[in-house]
Structures are given as C-alpha cells and as structure tokens.
C-alpha cells in the first residue's frame, strides 16, 4: 500500500508543471518558437517599416511589454 501511495505521489509530481514557462514565437520569417525564461511573462510583436522595400517584424519574450509593442500572455499568441 505504501508503494502504491509513493508511486502516485511521484507520478503526480512528474506530471504537474511546477514552474510554468511561456512559449512565444521568436522569428519574423517562420513559426520558430522558444520557451521563455521564468521571469519573462509576455510575448511581444512589433512590426516596422524602416524603408519602402520591406517590413521588419520582431517577436519574442519579455518581462514586461515594451512601449509601443503588441503583447500577450498566452502560449504562441504573438503571430
């Protein structure tokens, strides 16, 4: 009985996500993603046009939303 209880406790600990980390898209060209650090709690996206021939899109993780950027706080929300 003790073995069964111990097994259940171990399985519960392994299955629980004890330190949730956010996952954000990190590339402007494709859907590459990365797991954020524990202190990074938002995904960001910023698009800007430095010249007439193209657009640059920045995506990634941040600890707070940079001014002027679009941010969200769920996995893969910054596409």
Curated annotation (Swiss-Prot):
UniProt keyword list: Disulfide bond, Neurotoxin, Postsynaptic neurotoxin, Secreted, Signal, Toxin
Organism, as annotated: Bungarus fasciatus (Banded krait)
Cysteine disulfide partners in this protein: 24-43, 36-61, 65-71, 72-77
GO CC annotation, single: extracellular region
Tissue expression: Expressed by the venom gland.
Reported function: Blocks both the muscle-twitch response to nerve stimulation and the response to exogenous acetylcholine.
Signal peptide start-end: 1-21
Keyword hit for Ion transport: no
Similarity comment: Belongs to the three-finger toxin family. Short-chain subfamily. Orphan group XVIII sub-subfamily.
Localization per record: Secreted
UniProt-listed Pfam families: Toxin_cobra-type (PF21947)
Main localization (coarse): secreted
GO molecular function: toxin activity
Record protein name field: Neurotoxin 3FTx-LI
Entry keyword annotation includes Signal: yes
Taxonomy, superkingdom: Eukaryota
Organism lineage string: Eukaryota, Metazoa, Chordata, Craniata, Vertebrata
